[in-house]
Amino acid sequence: MVHHKVTIIGSGPAAHTAAIYLARAEIKPTLYEGMFANGVAAGGQLTTTTEIENFPGFPDGLTGSDLMERMKAQSVKFGTEVVTETVAKVDLSARPFKLWTEFNEDEEPTTTDAIILATGASAKRLGLPGEETYWQRGISACAVCDGAVPIFRNKPLAVVGGGDSACEEASFLTKYGSKVFMLVRKDHMRASTIMQRRVERNEKIEVLYNTAPVEAKGDGSLLDALRVRDTRTGEESDLPVNGLFYAIGHTPATQLVAGQVDLDESGYVKTVPGSTLTNVPGLFAAGDVQDSRYRQAVTSAGSGCMAALDAEKFLSELE
């Protein structure tokens, strides 16, 4: 039976930062990066980002794929074992924990003293016609990550959603766009009163109620319009915009541990405040799988560091 001291499940900034810290501490972690785990290539959601300008140390920016390749190279350099298999099942009922990879669920499990869960969260999409064509070519799920890139500057933009997050993203985008349309499917927002007032006072934001996007349009290279539908009359028209931002929530990749660890009402792993500890001793959660608020590459990396230090302390207390 194969046994690991620490197993990291994930392939984004949190996973590889945890691996770097553990490997440098000579703990020799094993990282399961997955084979299109949760529908995303190894490297996580960042691999779908064409340009990152807000990760410290890269004044000229770099692509999400480049950043993750560098992180992986660094974790491997210090001794991380990277396994390109997807963990399909875990048993957290007793230590050592047990895990099985995809297509090997009936085989003997691998055991591990500790697990760092860094499986991330995926942005909810609408599945519009044209969405795949213009994803990261005008369509994004993160205004803070992408709002400042050149294709959005001084251009009309749109935000889908009617909650606090949508209001926050619309307000943020007014720093860069010439105008921001909020597309709200119903005749009212569900955002808090204070956020609605903030939107109403911003001259660069126009709220389009009873409006739903039905198609992303462009020249095949960049988005330049949305086909929108009036949800009351069914009438459709084109809205000229160069950016579409989804603010309709994220889905944390917690199905692997559902029923075995405490999750919040949105499905994110609950951690002890100020740490990555969960209610299961030996299981640590890092990155977007436990962060419903910030969801940034740099905050994910920071929590990966925390998880490594928490895991190292846990292991030392076992000895």
From Swiss-Prot:
Location within or outside the cell: Cytoplasm
GO biological process: cell redox homeostasis; removal of superoxide radicals
Coiled-coil region(s): none
Origin species: Eremothecium gossypii (strain ATCC 10895 / CBS 109.51 / FGSC 9923 / NRRL Y-1056)
Disulfide bonds: 142-145
Known EC number: 1.8.1.9
EC main group: oxidoreductase
Residues where FAD binds: 11-14, 40-41, 45, 54, 87, 145, 288, 295-297
GO MF entries: thioredoxin-disulfide reductase (NADPH) activity
Keyword Zinc: no
Cofactor note (record): Binds 1 FAD per subunit.
Note: The active site is a redox-active disulfide bond.
Cofactor(s) the record lists: FAD
Keywords: Cytoplasm, Disulfide bond, FAD, Flavoprotein, NADP, Oxidoreductase, Redox-active center
GO cellular component, one term: cytosol
Xref: Pfam families: Pyr_redox_2
Family: Belongs to the class-II pyridine nucleotide-disulfide oxidoreductase family.
Official protein name in the record: Thioredoxin reductase
Catalytic activity: [thioredoxin]-dithiol + NADP(+) = [thioredoxin]-disulfide + NADPH + H(+)
Domain of life: Eukaryota
Subunit relationships: Homodimer.
